[in-house]
Amino acid sequence: MAAPMEVVVCTDAAAQLWSCVVWELHSGANLLTYRGGQAGPRGLALLNGEYLLAAQQGKNYICAWELQRKDQLQQKIMCPGPVTCLTTAPNGLYVLAGIAESIYLWEVCTGNLLVILSRHYQDVSCLKFTGDGSHFVSAGKDCLALAWSLCSVLQADPSRILAPRHVWSQHTLPITDLHCGFGGPMARVATASLDQTVKLWAISSGDLLLSVLFDMGITSVTMDLAEHHIFCGGSDGSIFQVDLCSWPGLREHSFQPEQNTGKVFKGHRNQVTCLSVSTDGSVLLSGSHDESVRLWDVKSKQCLRTVTLKGPVTNAAIILAPPSMLNPEFRPSLPLPHFNKHLLGAEHGDEAQGGGLRLQLGLHLQGKEPSYLERLEQLQAVLSSYLEKNMLGSQMLPARVFDLEDEVRSLRKINRDLFDFSTRIITRPSK
């Protein structure tokens, strides 16, 4: 079986020829292009391996394409305001969007707007789910990074104030990027800020594990899958590689480029906007405001390929191509529903029923659920059938007992005859 193909998905601010382009990582061959608008920074996401979502820069809607119907915009998801960042749950059940200082959470199978979280004081700049979808992290221009438990956010108690699991407030300038590692509730989160630091946090405890100081503002951050290295993109175009195993026990560290010349990638002429690492950790992808996307060999720090775009790069990531992306005959399992702009129950002025959420926890549970009266009728039918069988069985029981007793008497007679016959044979005198 062939290994999954790694592809690069990227967008730029100009969007003259296309909104999004997909090309093969190692050969650079163009595979797909999508048209329909300009995707904003950190506004690109795959939904369940079937749809591509792009938050339009400065506009109040999200474009959605089927992965194979690239020339036809499937849907525009209208939002209450311009979307500043976007992400989707790994299982494809939820969509998160940052709109101004609030976080909007939609359920994909129904399109219901479940929750609006308002704990940031300025615009939300980044949103990321953990690998298992149990938590998500938000960061904003208010210098705060918040770790949320999805289970707590979806709780249905209206009297309980929704609060993040952790509030990380050690940054002193706006947070520009964040990265969630693997491990679910044990994952580590890296945050980058204009205060010239990158900080590493533990979701499980909320502790600050490491703070690295640079000599410039950091505009992007990522880690390899093994989490041996943090890659930090600077405002001048430099990319720094921080080895997490180099300073055991140190909580704070200052990165000096002149002392770490073998840990700096040089080539971009403007700030680095996005970073991504290949699955095996050997290739680093970077996008910049200098209108170029570069592929780097991590070990040698050499630039392997440069792709020039028509505008500043807003999104660039290395992903494993889902089967639907490479299969021309593939169609989504379910169409996207209409996404509501108002909270569930509030769209029709139904405040009385706003205290609970009806959650469908699977993509294929679309459709009308039976009412309680219908469920009661089904239960009564099952109970009646069970009682009927029991009554019928109780009437046949005496006849069955009589048959078994008769069979036992017959077997006893056969056994006695067999015993008598054997005794006569054994005791017969020999001639």
UniProtKB/Swiss-Prot annotation:
Q: What does this protein do?
A: Functions as a component of the Five Friends of Methylated CHTOP (5FMC) complex; the 5FMC complex is recruited to ZNF148 by methylated CHTOP, leading to desumoylation of ZNF148 and subsequent transactivation of ZNF148 target genes. Component of the PELP1 complex involved in the nucleolar steps of 28S rRNA maturation and the subsequent nucleoplasmic transit of the pre-60S ribosomal subunit. May play a role during development.
- Please state the protein's primary subcellular location: nucleus
Record bears the keyword Nucleus:
yes
- Cellular component annotations (GO), alphabetically ordered: dynein axonemal particle; nucleolus; nucleoplasm
Read off the Pfam families from this record.
WD40, WD40_alt
Q: Which PANTHER family has this protein been placed in?
A: WD REPEAT-CONTAINING PROTEIN 18 (PTHR18763:SF0), WD-REPEAT PROTEIN 18 (PTHR18763)
Known Gene3D superfamilies for this protein? YVTN repeat-like/Quinoprotein amine dehydrogenase
What are the start and end residues of each WD repeat?
A: 36-75, 78-116, 119-158, 170-211, 213-257, 267-306
Where found? Nucleus, Nucleolus; Nucleus, Nucleoplasm; Cytoplasm; Dynein axonemal particle
Q: Does the keyword Cytoplasm apply?
A: yes
Which protein are we looking at?
WD repeat-containing protein 18
Note the InterPro entries from the entry. G-protein_beta_WD-40_rep, WD40/YVTN_repeat-like_dom_sf, WD40_repeat_CS, WD40_repeat_dom_sf, WD40_rpt, WDR18/Ipi3/RID3, Wdr18_C_dom
User: Which family does the similarity line name?
Assistant: Belongs to the WD repeat IPI3/WDR18 family.
Which keywords label this protein?
A: Cytoplasm, Developmental protein, Nucleus, Repeat, WD repeat
- Relate the assembly described in the record: Component of the 5FMC complex, at least composed of PELP1, LAS1L, TEX10, WDR18 and SENP3; the complex interacts with methylated CHTOP and ZNF148. Interacts with NOL9. Component of the PELP1 complex, composed of at least PELP1, TEX10 and WDR18. The complex interacts with pre-60S ribosome particles.
